[in-house]
Regions:
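Glycine-rich phosphate-binding loops of nucleotide-dependent enzymes
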Residues: 2-235
Length: 235
C-alpha cells in the first residue's frame, strides 16, 4: 500500500527544551516500491540529537519499511538520506552500523547455535594480545543485561532462550555498538513490565547523551509515555 502524507505531532506530555535545531538523521522524499507498488512515498522528516521520535500507523502504512531503509536492509527507490547533514547511501546494515545506526528488529537476527555473548559481539569481537577475549565479552554482556534488569546468561546458547530473552539479546547487541541512532521496531511486545521500564530508562539515557531514538509501536500509551514527537504514517 502507498503511505499517505505523514504527520508529525509534538507530544503534550513530553518535550525537551534543549533539543538541537540541526537534524542528526534526515530523510527527504524517501520512497520505496516493491514490484512497482509504492509502500512508502515522499517521506520527509528529521530527527534531532536528544530526541525520541515515535512512529505509528496501520499495518501496511510503511513503518517497518521506513526503519529498514534507514538501517540498510532495503535500498530506497527514490529520495535521499542525510546523516549529520551529509547525504549517505546506506546500501547494507554494515554501512548503517559504521555510521552509528543500530536497529532492534521485530525479526530476530541471531544465530541459534552460537552463545549469547558471541551473538552480541559477532563481527566486533573483543581481543587481547591478538586472541579473543572471551572473559571480557562475557563481562560486557553481563553488564548490559544488568542495565536491562534481566538475567540472561551470556554463555547460554541462543537456541535455548525464550522469545523474551532473545529480544533482550538484540537490545544488548544494539547497546554494545556505541551507536548514535537507535531504531526499535515493536520492541516491547514480548517484554515484561519491569523489562519495558528498564528499556525506556535506557532510551531516555541514550537521548540525554545526544543520541536519537526512533520507536515504532502500536501501543499508544507507550508512545505517549516515552516519545517527544510522533510520526503518523497513513495508507
Amino acid at each position: 500500500m502507498t503511505a499517505g502524507q505523514p504527520q508529525v505531532a509534538p507530544q503534550e506530555a513530553a518535550s525537551r527544551s534543549d533539543l538541537s535545531s540541526s537534524d542528526l538523521l534526515r530523510v527527504e522524499n524517501l520512497t520505496k516500491a516493491f514490484s512497482g507498488v509504492e509502500v512508502l512515498k515522499n517521506l520527509t522528516l528529521g530527527i534531532r540529537p536528544g530526541e525520541i521520535l515515535g512512529v505509528i500507523g496501520e499495518n501496511g502504512a510503511g513503518k517497518s519499511t521506513f526503519m529498514k531503509l534507514i538501517s540498510g536492509v532495503y535500498s530506497p527507490t527514490g529520495g535521499r538520506i542525510l546523516f549529520d547533514g551529509e547525504p549517505v547511501r546506506i546500501a547494507n546494515p554494515l554501512i548503517a552500523q559504521r555510521l552509528g545506526i543500530a536497529m532492534i528488529p521485530q525479526e530476530f537476527n541471531l544465530i541459534n547455535p552460537l552463545r549469547v555473548y558471541e551473538n552480541i559481539f559477532l563481527g566486533r569481537e573483543l581481543r587481547r594480545g591478538g586472541m579473543l577475549d572471551r572473559s571480557r565479552m562475557i563481562a560486557e554482556a553481563r553488564r548490559h543485561f544488568a542495565t536491562l534488569a534481566t538475567d540472561v546468561a551470556p554463555d547460554a546458547l541462543v537456541g535455548d532462550l525464550s522469545v523474551a530473552e532473545k529480544q533482550m539479546v538484540e537490545i544488548a547487541k544494539a547497546m554494545s555498538q556505541e551507536s548514535r541512532v537507535l531504531i526499535l521496531d515493536e520492541p516491547t511486545t514480548v517484554l515484561s513490565g519491569a523489562e519495558i521500564d528498564a528499556l525506556f530508562a535506557i532510551m531516555r539515557d541514550f537521548a540525554a547523551k545526544g543520541g536519537a531514538v526512533l520507536f515504532v509501536s502500536h501501543k499508544l500509551a507507550e508512545v505517549r509515555e516515552i516519545c517527544d514527537r510522533v510520526l503518523v504514517l497513513r495508507d
